[in-house]
From Swiss-Prot:
Induction per the UniProt record: By IL6/interleukin-6, prolactin and growth hormone.
Record-level GO BP terms: insulin receptor signaling pathway; intracellular signal transduction; layer formation in cerebral cortex; negative regulation of signal transduction; proteasome-mediated ubiquitin-dependent protein catabolic process; protein ubiquitination; regulation of neuron migration
Tissue-wise expression: Expressed in brain and leukocytes. Also in fetal lung fibroblasts and fetal brain.
PROSITE patterns (UniProt xref): SH2 (PS50001), SOCS (PS50225)
Gene Ontology MF terms: phosphorylation-dependent protein binding; SH3 domain binding; signaling adaptor activity; ubiquitin-like ligase-substrate adaptor activity
Keywords assigned: Cell membrane, Cytoplasm, Growth regulation, Membrane, Nucleus, SH2 domain, Signal transduction inhibitor, Ubl conjugation pathway
Gene Ontology CC annotations of this record: Cul5-RING ubiquitin ligase complex; cytoplasm; cytosol; nucleus; plasma membrane
General function of this protein: Substrate-recognition component of a cullin-5-RING E3 ubiquitin-protein ligase complex (ECS complex, also named CRL5 complex), which mediates the ubiquitination and subsequent proteasomal degradation of target proteins, such as DAB1 and IRS1. Specifically recognizes and binds phosphorylated proteins via its SH2 domain, promoting their ubiquitination.
Protein's name according to its UniProt entry: Suppressor of cytokine signaling 7
Amino acid sequence: MVFRNVGRPPEEEDVEAAPEPGPSELLCPRHRCALDPKALPPGLALERTWGPAAGLEAQLAALGLGQPAGPGVKTVGGGCCPCPCPPQPPPPQPQPPAAAPQAGEDPTETSDALLVLEGLESEAESLETNSCSEEELSSPGRGGGGGGRLLLQPPGPELPPVPFPLQDLVPLGRLSRGEQQQQQQQQPPPPPPPPGPLRPLAGPSRKGSFKIRLSRLFRTKSCNGGSGGGDGTGKRPSGELAASAASLTDMGGSAGRELDAGRKPKLTRTQSAFSPVSFSPLFTGETVSLVDVDISQRGLTSPHPPTPPPPPRRSLSLLDDISGTLPTSVLVAPMGSSLQSFPLPPPPPPHAPDAFPRIAPIRAAESLHSQPPQHLQCPLYRPDSSSFAASLRELEKCGWYWGPMNWEDAEMKLKGKPDGSFLVRDSSDPRYILSLSFRSQGITHHTRMEHYRGTFSLWCHPKFEDRCQSVVEFIKRAIMHSKNGKFLYFLRSRVPGLPPTPVQLLYPVSRFSNVKSLQHLCRFRIRQLVRIDHIPDLPLPKPLISYIRKFYYYDPQEEVYLSLKEAQLISKQKQEVEPST
């Protein structure tokens, strides 16, 4: 069933009054069948042929006949049933009648329904059918939107009838929805049409649902680019058809989806603009673990580049990683040595087998067995000075170490000595352990010795070749380089503009150069065995305790000075005791 708008409403013309002929002379075959059920051809039953949709078409035809006639329009018997169709030859096939409108329906919605129903027939079928004249389009009963000719086509029993009423469709036209509703409210409602003589009977379903036929026609017209409705051909612009098709496809609901489930997704101009089209995606967005999938199995045409494998996990135990690559002697190294300096191959992850080939160092088994195992020469490893305490015990045996001494006493010891004379003493600063006093350019200089990560040097961050595990090794190396004319260290001058002072160590000042007294040797031994804070608790007279608490390096002048001072103190004490008695 198709209602087509065949042209614009022409200008109203004055028609002279004529004698009113009979209804059969004024009505076209379509309207005659709608009013008189006997006009059907013999052997054609409306109930068996057209099904439930015939009632809707008959109602629309009767509503068109029930509208009030406009000026210059012929009427049937002076009533309100216009039929401006001129007498035309009968169609090649007999047209079935249309049923009368049912009671309770609003005839104001007929114009919107007629606008929607204009797309039910294809363009090829519309050229063969007879259309109404232009006078019918000027009738106010059409709502100003143009009328149409009712064509009934025999349906097939494949698909069910229309799942939704015609009144629920979106009204189409040149105006928006709000403007059309306001225009309908302003127009007076026409009188209800009289009931028709025909009643719809149940029959087989039509061929194709209403939504499918509409979408098929609109898809064809929108792709072909139909002309506008103002050119006299009765066709609306393709933009309006596309909008109406989008509205109808959205209102199809689940019934249309179930019918089109077996069809392949077809992309049309209407669907691409208003409705989504489902494609089978190449990438579903699912993440896959790289350990479970080998990237070498991907094809060359894959849009995604191969992803590199994740870095291998290291074992928590460092000894487990290097036990198979390093000799046993390195594992028994002292605590001060750093194991991070040795390159380690990445071990495989313990949780999963190797899914990717890893680069491993090439090892020749024959060369390992043929060559004897070489001992790694670690510069930080010394078996005789593996701890700080051992290095201090080694330092006490050296004569150039003078123990606790301040810088004034050190200058007194180095006074008059040649350049290159030096001694090592305990630092008076509690932040440092040892200090170096040396003679250079006729002046005595003092500098602190740094202890950095188990090594000794004159700088806070010495170079690798300057690091020494013990003080004895450091002094011996400095003496060797000083004799060769190579100076390892230089001191910045306190006077701006002067060059730095080279540290030259050539002549150690030993504390064993002078013969020591028995008193000093006893004090030296006691200081080696007893802590300095426990000296006052020793069972000794107070003069001996005061002597032991003093510096324990040997100085003959100090011995003479102390002996004279002690003699004076003893004489004073005796003089004080005699008057008191």
